[in-house]
A protein has these predicted regions:
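N-terminal cap/lid segment of alpha/beta-hydrolase-fold proteins
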Residues: 2-18
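A contiguous binding-surface segment within folded domains or other stable secondary-structure elements
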Residues: 5-9, 113, 123
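A generic structural signal for well-ordered alpha-helical segments
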Residues: 12, 53-54, 113
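Conserved acidic catalytic loop of the alpha/beta-hydrolase fold
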Residues: 88-121
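Active-site loop->helix "elbow" adjoining a glycine-rich segment at hydrolase catalytic centers
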Residues: 105, 127-128
Length: 128
C-alpha cells in the first residue's frame, strides 16, 4: 500500500460534545464509519488502510475520536472512573455508576452522522 496524503481533521458538535473526525474518499459515496475501541485514537485506523477502503470499496470512510480520546471533548469534570470499583460492583450484581456508557458512545456515533447529514452508513468497529 502507498502512503495516503495527510487528512484535514475537523470537529463537529454532536450529542452535546465536540467530536474530532476526518474522512477519505468521495463525500458523496456510500459512508463507512470506523469506530475505534476503548482508549485508542482514530489514527489507529491507519491512513493507508482508510484510503484503500475508500478506493477499493467506493466508500466515504469516516473515522473519529471517541469522547475522552484524542482531539474530541475530554470530560475531565466527570472524573476518572475507578475501574477496580466498577468491576467489583459488576461482580456483586450492583448497578454501575459511570460518567457515561456505551449507549452514550453509540449516541455520539449517531450524532456525528446526523451532523454530517448522513442517514445511513456501514459501521465497522474495533474492540479492545
Amino acid at each position: 500500500m502507498t502512503a495516503a496524503p495527510p487528512r484535514v481533521e475537523q470537529r463537529t458538535r454532536a450529542n452535546g460534545i465536540e467530536l474530532a473526525w476526518d474522512s477519505f474518499g468521495d463525500p458523496a459515496a456510500e459512508p463507512l464509519l470506523l469506530v475505534m475501541g476503548l482508549g485508542a485514537q482514530m489514527v489507529a485506523w491507519d491512513d493507508a488502510f482508510c484510503a484503500r477502503l475508500a478506493e477499493a470499496g467506493g466508500h466515504r470512510v469516516i473515522r473519529f475520536d471517541n469522547r475522552d480520546i484524542g482531539h474530541s471533548t475530554h470530560l475531565t469534570l466527570l472524573g476518572v472512573p475507578d475501574i477496580q470499583a466498577l468491576m467489583a460492583q459488576a461482580m456483586a450484581g450492583l448497578p454501575l455508576r459511570a460518567p457515561y456508557d456505551l449507549r452514550d458512545m453509540a449516541a455520539d456515533c449517531v450524532g456525528l452522522l446526523d451532523a454530517l447529514g448522513i442517514a445511513r452508513a456501514h459501521i465497522v468497529g474495533a474492540s479492545m
